[in-house]
Curated annotation (Swiss-Prot):
Cleaves peptides in various proteins in a process that requires ATP hydrolysis. Has a chymotrypsin-like activity. Plays a major role in the degradation of misfolded proteins. Keywords: Cytoplasm, Hydrolase, Protease, Serine protease. This is ATP-dependent Clp protease proteolytic subunit. It catalyses: Hydrolysis of proteins to small peptides in the presence of ATP and magnesium. alpha-casein is the usual test substrate. In the absence of ATP, only oligopeptides shorter than five residues are hydrolyzed (such as succinyl-Leu-Tyr-|-NHMec, and Leu-Tyr-Leu-|-Tyr-Trp, in which cleavage of the -Tyr-|-Leu- and -Tyr-|-Trp bonds also occurs). Its main location: cytoplasm. It is an enzyme of class 3 (hydrolase). It is found in: Cytoplasm. Belongs to the peptidase S14 family. PANTHER family: ATP-DEPENDENT CLP PROTEASE PROTEOLYTIC SUBUNIT. GO terms for molecular function: ATP-dependent peptidase activity; ATPase binding; serine-type endopeptidase activity.
């Protein structure tokens, strides 16, 4: 069981308690923490759509500390990030691996940051399948299609050539924050809040 801190705020009717993530959502801050899976992705998508409905002109901040996870769940978040009108600033604290790194790169150009000791990792998608030979062949074709799609998404957001992205994602490719900036996944490494213009 995870302990989530509560924040108590005074109101005209007394005090009101929020869990810390709900309170931060009021400030237009969304957290992506832990493995990316369907339920978590649905919550993030709902938060993005809610914040857009509340104010389509005001920026959203997304803080990422994730080892990655299910590709389709991550792509639902990615597509929603591209779909909504507000600009989305992304910030890696801790790690942004696999789908986490794709979401980090998907932030608004110029607003993608990482803290100095963050670790970013890109790689090709992986999967394991069992069953009849024909079913395995179907799944193998699908994972190759997903690999190709992810490569093009990284090309779009990093500005790298497709051949560079393919070579860089052949195996687990761990990067420091500075290396991720050089690669084009982020725009800036920040040490203090004053270093960021969001």
């Amino acid at each position: 069981m995870t302990l989530v801190p509560m924040v108590v705020e005074p109101t005209s009717r007394g005090e009101r308690a929020y869990d810390i993530y709900t309170r931060l959502l009021k400030e237009r801050i969304i957290f992506i923490t832990g493995p990316i899976e369907d339920q978590m992705a649905s919550l993030v998508v709902a938060q993005l759509i809610f914040l857009e409905a509340e104010n389509p002109e005001k920026d959203i901040s997304m803080y990422i500390n994730s080892p990655g996870g299910v590709v389709t769940a991550g792509l639902s978040i990615y597509d929603t990030m591209q779909y909504v009108k507000p600009r989305i600033a992304t910030l890696c604290l801790g790690q942004a691996a696999s789908m986490g790194s794709l979401l980090l790169a998907a932030g608004e150009k110029g607003m993608r940051c990482a803290l100095p000791n963050s670790r970013i990792m890109i790689h090709q998608p992986s999967g394991g399948f069992q069953g009849q030979a024909t079913d395995i062949e179907i799944h193998a074709k699908e994972i190759l299609n997903i690999k190709s799609r992810l490569n093009y998404i990284y090309v779009k957001h990093t500005g790298r050539e497709l051949s560079e992205v393919v070579a860089s994602m052949e195996r687990d490719n761990f990067m420091s924050a500075d290396s991720a900036q050089d690669f084009g996944i982020i725009d800036k490494v920040i040490e203090k809040r004053l270093d960021i213009e969001v």
